[in-house]
Swiss-Prot record:
Species whose genome carries this gene: Trypanosoma cruzi (strain CL Brener)
Subunit structure comment from the entry: Monomer. Binds to DNA as a monomer.
Cofactor binding mode and count: Binds 1 Fe(2+) ion per subunit.
Protein name listed in UniProt: Thymine dioxygenase JBP1-A
Record-annotated site: Involved in J base recognition, conferring specificity towards J-DNA: D542
GO biological process: base J metabolic process
Biased composition, class Basic and acidic residues, residue ranges: 1-12
Enzyme Commission number(s) from the entry: 1.14.11.6
Chain spans, region Disordered: 1-24
Organism ancestry: Eukaryota, Discoba, Euglenozoa, Kinetoplastea, Metakinetoplastina
Gene name, Swiss-Prot/TrEMBL: JBP1A
Amino acid sequence: MKQKRGKQDVKMLESAPPQLLPKKGRLEISELAPQQRTIRTAEEIETAYNEAVRKHPFYDNADHTIDFHDATVFRDARGVVGGVFLPGALPAFAATMAADVLRPAAVRTSLRSNMFGGFAPLSGIAGYFDYRGSPVELKCRKTSFTYENVHSWPNVFPMIDYVSAIYKAVFPEQWAAQDAAVPDIVRIHGSPFSTLTVNQQFRTASHTDAGDFDMGYGLLAVLEGKFEGLSLALDDFGVCFRMQPRDILIFNTHFFHSNTEPELNHPRDDWSRLTCVCYYRAALGEPACVAEYERRLARAKEIGASPPPAVDAILQKDNGNNFNKPAPTFPYLLTPFGGAASVCSLHCCTAKLLRLHELLLENPTLEVILFGESLRTDDGLPRREKEQLISVHLPVVVKMSPSGGFSELGGALKAAEEKQYFFEEKYLADELGPDLMSMWTQSRAHWLRLVKEDWERLCRRDPERTKFTWNNSSAMNAAFFDLCEVAKQMMIGLLNKETPSSAENHSFWILFAAHLNYACTTENGMPRDAVGMHKLNVKLKDFHFGGTRYLKDMPPEEQERRLERKKRIEEARRRGSSAHETHTDNWLLNDTFDYQQEDRKVEFEENGWMTPEAYVKHLGLKPCGDVTAAASPTEPIHVLVVLPRPAAAATAKDAKRDVPLATSEESIRLLMNPAAQRVLRGKARNVALPSPLSFGGVKITVLFDGDDIDCIHPDFVILQHLLATIEEDEAAKARVKYWARVARYCVFVVETDVRDRRHFLLREEVRVAYEDVAEDCFRSLHAAAYSTKYNRLRTTPSLIALCNRKNIGLRFKFRGSPLNTIALVVVGERLD
């Protein structure tokens, strides 16, 4: 009923004479609302995308070698921790409470479009920010979101407290350094964090988080969502973390990182994902911000501010050296053993896994013995061409106008020109108080007079001139901002609400601009588009962000004049408004010392919540200690490789005879690459068993599935393409469980993944063509490689299901493998 009634109102407004228009009607005219969806041309998409990805490319899951599924401590080649992955570490209630508050913080912003392929993502900041490099006049303060949501803001604190406690438990030294550096008045609830970045449905391209504290870490928490994929990837290291709601990743934000693709059955399928990054914005501890805190504090004491300041003095702390540059990277060659050494549930055998990792690097031929093929094949499955993949952004995308102005697309400009008379005095006088109307009339006349003077001066130099040149340092420019201040209070008064909606803001300011443009023509005698809607739109955006001249750069007397005038305008609006007085969400003008006024104590025990300290103990978190050294070459390590038993009647000749003809583009790609041809023409890998091998203390035994193993007690078991020979899923699952019990530590399940590595990025016609031939082609390759007549090939999701998702430590992808081979690390029991 409400929607229907709204439509009727709009219809009435379009036909009613101006004098009968109700107060809110002017700002809800349908033609003036911004376009919800705008179709960009192919050229616009291509230009925006190419410019963005030149500096910030997207990387897909296939571009990374390891996907971590379980708790992980990932280190670089020097042993320095790059990331700690903690699945499910955030309590559900804390995640939900924070999500309910922070969800609206993520708004369309062009400021991060370079990390989203040239398009405005849903992103925002909360807490405190320095606004260095921004046209906002007043620096080093609460974000607008925090200021406007001060009453609900404390619901974020449980999440902050848990995340801080987890950070402290895992990285006590870095936590202490960050805690010592962050100014007390810009802490979020006593934590070492000053700022939150909130992202919604935002697949980030590769970037570093410039401005974060160099001596600390950032913490990424997934608050809510329904999605697959979108792993957080450390691009220079070739690893990514499969995150889901309530997961936490503590990582070095100065490494290049990004999100992999969303894993959707169809590109237009819905998905949702709300994340929050907690960090210390280092500029908030620099002298310029400290001076701003001191200025505000002195002013608060001088006027006897109420409530009183939360602190008596500002302390300049040691903020360390923050270079705002990418951190140096020291990647290493990835192997299944090296990856498994990072998995927390295998920390008791880390030294042994690192020894096996070293052994593989020393003896690359062992890769074939252990896994059936090399970890990297240069002439195997070729990389997909760009033309075979869907765009990162679909052809129809949301194109939003930046905050503070209006959309210049569609019929909005024409509709605004037709209705500009709404700003005439006879239509406003009955709805606004006399004081505010007087300010509007005087400010409008003053600005038009200055515009006319500037125009006449320009025309004396060039009588043929048709366009007005806007001088940003002129009295006319200052008068325009004064006029905007009056208009802003008029909007609030007309709507009887402190926070107009985006549509109401848009409608008001486009009408405002149309009225001024019309007045320049009719009252100043200027050409119709001498000033123009576009130029007024640009200046309105300047006004929204504080003007082109920062308040702090103005002479003291001018600063005082502007602040006092803003105050008088607001008071005039309040005197003329019948609405009850509410909290003023006038963030841009807030120059009070309101730091920490929003802080509240969290009553954990009273609410039946575990305290952060108790929760950390419950999780069993321990500090990341020094890097574990590889086991000595003489330490006993036993690796058992299990091969599928060859079928009695199967021969290489039989396998070759069953190879399908490579007639389609996809079958040629799968079967005719040099590595695939070697498999088809070569000897099967399981025709004969090699003798046991020894490398110091490392012993490698190879046997067939089903052989007697009574006297064998391996540390690690590698199942080499065994599950492909088992038709029934339950039987395959039972076999994994059996070998997991045999292995002392973990099992490496090595199998063909019949799904294309870029499955979720393939154009539909390419995906269909691939799926038509993939299973037959891989069956032929598998039969040739393992001398089997029957095989059932599976996808990664089905293999993970067979191995029990909660027992998966990681997935390793063999790069360029002709069999599209992967290895899953399966931990049979949770080991302390």
